[in-house]
From Swiss-Prot:
Stretch forming the signal peptide: none
Gene name per UniProt: ERB1
Species this protein is from: Eremothecium gossypii (strain ATCC 10895 / CBS 109.51 / FGSC 9923 / NRRL Y-1056) (Yeast)
One Pfam family recorded for the sequence: BOP1NT
Protein localization: Nucleus, Nucleolus; Nucleus, Nucleoplasm
Region (Disordered): 1-129
Biased composition (Acidic residues): 45-60, 81-99, 108-124
GO cellular component, one term: preribosome, large subunit precursor
UniProt-recorded name of the protein: Ribosome biogenesis protein ERB1
Biological processes per GO annotation: maturation of 5.8S rRNA from tricistronic rRNA transcript (SSU-rRNA, 5.8S rRNA, LSU-rRNA); maturation of LSU-rRNA from tricistronic rRNA transcript (SSU-rRNA, 5.8S rRNA, LSU-rRNA)
Amino acid sequence: MVHSKKDKSVMKHSDIKKRGAAVLEEEDVLQQDEQLLVDGATIDCDSDDDEEFQSAEEEVLSSGSESSSKEGSTPGSPVEGSDEEAEDEDADEEEDEDAEFNRLLAAEEGDSEGEYGSEDFSDDNDTRPLREKLSSMQLKMIPDGESASVKTRYSDGTPRIIKPEITPVYDSDDTDVETANTIGNIPLSAYDEMPHIGYDINGKRIMRPAKGSALDALLDTIELPEGWTGLLDQNTGSSLNLTPEELDLISKIQKNEQVDDSVDPYEPYVDWFTRHEEIMPVTAIPEPKRRFVPSKHEAKRIMKIVKAIREGRIIPPNKLRELREQEQANNFSYDLWGDSEETNEHIMNLRAPKLPPPTNEESYNPPEEYLLTPEERAEWEKMDPSDRKRNFLPQKYGSLRKVPGYGESVRERFERSLDLYLAPRVRKNKLNIDPESLIPELPSPKDLRPFPIRCSTVYAGHKGKIRTLSIDPSGLWLATGSDDGTVRVWEILTGREVYKATIVDIKNNQDDHIETVEWNPDKTVGLLAVAAGENIYLLVPPIFGFEVENNSRLKIENGYGFDTFGNVKKSALNVNSDDEQAETEATVKKQVAQWNKPTQKQAENDVAIVITCRKTVKKISWHRKGDYFVSVQPESGHTSVLIHQLSKHLTQSPFNKSKGIIMDAKFHPFKPQLFVCSQRYIRIYDLSQQVLVKKLLPGARWLSTIDIHPRGDNLIASSFDKRVLWHDLDLAATPYKTLRYHEKAVRSVGFHKKLPLFCSAADDGTIHVFHGTVYDDMMKNPLLVPLKKLTGHKLVNSLGVLDTVWHPREAWLFSAGADNTARLWTT
């Protein structure tokens, strides 16, 4: 059967409609979540094998070719023909189809919008619904995970894979994502009269969505759907609704919540800066403080500018002209005889001190009282130039023209130049402090009585200066030792001399002097230790009665049973040993002192025993029990300190090495300790453990004597550099107080045994009496109060008071001076 061209065109038109309906149905199906293939073939969505897809494609292509061949021919039409005729016929058909398609499009574009209906886009031959059409087909869903493998056909029939849509997330970059409507930069008004509004990425038309009625718009505003904005999307023509993600984002912003779910607002806090010391530095260094405070360098620059403006070094432009005019005016009126203008000196500039103005004694015609007598002139000339109060002698001239030139002007200028060059200048700021506030509040001396205030008795009789004195334990007898070689005993109340013994014959021996005398503290004996030269004499003065004198001599004689009389025992010597060192080990240490019986002449002077040492003995101090006494020989090296035992006639040296020049040594009042005073240090030794307990640092250049408080926790020391040092043994090794009241070397210091008094005597001829209270409370410091300054001894050869001693019970003080007298000071 042969069809005409008109029939063919009608058939082609119907085919176009069928294809359009199929395209619409295919779009509806593809918009669903599950994508389907409905070309008559069955595709297994669960299979991932490429061979299955290839076979499915071949079936689809074969079925399409069969259907097209069936549609293109009738049962009665001939199939045979030449290839050329077939090709010509196909070409004609294609041209006819294109022409018909263009005509239909032109007709559609020319029609109005209201002429389109559903029947124009429906299939006339088959009016069944899509569900019935698909009922006879086998369909399988393709999961979303395999949506990338869904394949369709292009317009020429070749297969194409439809890739899944890109779902942008927060971290993705969607700046290059193409929109659904790909018309480009063309105004949408060009599609106002068309059923579609553009084309998608696949080149298919995007049909204009149907518009609702006014009632629907009103209902939409009343019952707002989720994501409703009331706006119209110009690209799609539909209402612009917000997605759930956008609604969630807006809700979080309104609630001030975290927008990004990947950020944890409650993550654990990392303490970068802790109290624990880290090895490696932390990179998160905090901002330095200088970022938040004003800059010091800028402040300095600003102050420099301000100072320059104040000083006139920076002049504003408006004042510069005035200054120039004023300067020109001043140049015409210059005061030749005017004073020079003073310039502002630098802050670090220190002017040289001005010379003192001349006084009346420097006048060429001074008053008569300023002129020196011949005796004063001779005394001035004998003095050293450094000791003179003035470096010139006042002279009187009749007139000014008779005054000669000053011969010392060059020397004075030179000395002033040296002073300015060598002496540093210091600016001292005066402090406005009330001097009375610096004086500590001390109790009145009237409230601290009794203490010695006057001289009651003078013990005169010695022909040389009295170097030492001592009071016996009973407090009735005073012993003195003088450079005349005699020891005298005085009755303290009457000042009567009751005993005299010549120890040193000054005619034959002028080198030895009586250095010290000390009574034995035991009241049952009457022993007097006298140190003269290298010997120590123990005397028993016949003033105490038979019983006391007998006990004294008996105590000395009992020691002869332990005396070796110079025969020293040697250590055991091994005769079978050939070692040369054995003989050295068997040798005995040299004897440090000898206990000898007195000669007949010495016995007549009541000398009981004589102890001979190596060097001159300067100090003697008894132990409180009266059996031991210590002697000091400054020139004897490591044997400077010797401890003598009266009951055994034994002498031993406690030290093996010399600790400097020893000046004094005394026992602790009740502990087995020995205080050793050298020139600069005071050391305290424990005799029982034979260890050094403490070392005191007085800070003096040359110590002279020491004395220990009866409680044993405080000590005073005197020095030749005019200082008295109080040491608290419970505190530091440095002095608690330093007293500087004397003008010359301090010779003696001493504590009272019962009362809170102590004194110091010096070569200036004065004795200072102090009140010293030591509290039982360890938290309170000792109270030191100056009480009285006693004067009465005369100076002889720059020597004043040489020794002092307190009465055992009363507040009386005995002193020995270089004026050959001893004095008793009472209350």
